[in-house]
Amino acid sequence: MRKKLIAVIAVAALSLPLFACSSGEKTELSKYTIDATLSADNILTATVTCDYVNNNDVPLKELWFHLYPNAYRDGAKYSPVAANRITDAYPSGKSYSVMKIDSVSVNGNAKDVTVSGEDENILVVPLGDTLDPTEKTSVKIEYSVKLPKVKHRFGYTDKSVNLGNFYPIACMYRDGAFVADPYYSTGDPFFSECADYSVTLTVPDKYECAATGEITGKTEAENAVTYEIGAQNVRDFAAVLGEYQKMSGLSGSTIVNYLYYSDSEPEKALNAAIDSVRIFGDKFGAYPYKEYTVVQTGFLQGGMEYPALSMISDAYSGDSKLDIIVHETAHQWWYGVVGNDEVKHSWLDEAMAEYSTMMFYEYAEGYKYTFDAKRADALAAYILYCETYKNNGRDDTSMTRAVNEYASETEYTYMIYVKGALMLDDVRNTVGTEKFMAGLKKYYADNKFGIAQPQDLMGAMEKASKRQLKPLFESWLNGNVQLYSNH
């Protein structure tokens, strides 16, 4: 997710009070079949069938599913929106979701389930029979949820409907337990494996649809339109609805779409997306999907990435908007194709996306920003922030913390986005551009559709450069690096 621009945050820092799938061998993927209907009053009724393949090395007696929409309910322990952004996110006043699980069955047999987790964020489904490694089971979940009116991943505004993280998705299983992180307001607190999706989405007929994957069918009926959508080997599925105009173009063989409702220069946004897919594909490895869609919507932050789909806030225009499009497109490689635990290792996709954005301006022509200027701005902003940070009695500049361990979105943004990009630039300067780029390509190829760990990136860079780089990475990650301005 793209936070507010670094230059804007640097100014804000001055006013702080004195105290932001499977890889390797081929394995069968799980599949989600979703049949959802959105009413005119923004109530979503859906049936999700998860044909779950146990790609873990241990047998399972139950499955856990994230219930992300529950985080928007009244009384939630954790709000998806930071306390200091509530007014911006809810301009019409606070609005809550209401989620109801109507029924759950496993292989056709009804099950008594439990909603648990730290914040009623987990659906626990007993399987009955043990599910051994490589075996498959089918879990059917019928539910309904009233969407909140909020400028966020899941919710609606006067101009659009965001369906991000709207369905029960299987929890990852790691180190002998299901990963059940709640919906923290800092960062993007998600972690999922790649799967196949077949989605039927029926919505009021005024809406056009932007979605992960390909829209393979569109059927109109009285006051409604039904979209058939397919996506293979993607880490998540999301959709955005609105009264959109659409432009499309090609980046190589990839169809690139831009959907918008308020843009005086839509061709610039489309071209930024096309250029990003082309440059990142050349520098990192080929974009693996047939289509990529950028969509304008009501959103609190600058943008939000989903596989083959990027939400871009309608609050931005001009060069700032183009910069956000580039950042979110970079996430198609770092998060979308190469996955990571976004709670524990958030720098692994955000720092990579931010530095990729800087590099974009090295190879693209006709844009306001340059690589050197972006790098200089990042260094100046980070040094200024750290000076203010120290004056406020804080000295932890480590990047190894989970997203909920940062004191604020501002601290998170500087440590993960800004410092993370500077770290990667230091690695590049240490090994040289040619070997650095070779390391990025190796990292992408080795971890495509899988879950990467920090050591995977370090290892790819070490193999490409034939140098020991772990101490360099760790000095940045652990907060030992000290940065100084040349001025």
How should these model regions be labeled?
Residues 12, 20-45:
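N-terminal, polar/Ser/Thr-rich
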Residues 24, 73-127, 214-220:
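Solvent-exposed beta-strand/loop surfaces of large extracellular or lumenal domains
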Residues 45, 49-71, 75-76:
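Ligand-binding face of N-terminal immunoglobulin V-set domains in extracellular IgSF glycoproteins
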Residues 188-326, 355:
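Hydrophobic helix-coil surface modules that form long, contiguous segments used
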Residues 267, 312-381:
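Zinc-dependent metallopeptidase catalytic helix centered on the HExxH motif
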Residues 350, 354-422, 430, 447, ...:
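Acidic/His/Gly-enriched intrinsically disordered linker/tail segments
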Residues 448-487:
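Beta/coil-rich, acidic/histidine-enriched accessory regions frequently appended to metallopeptidases
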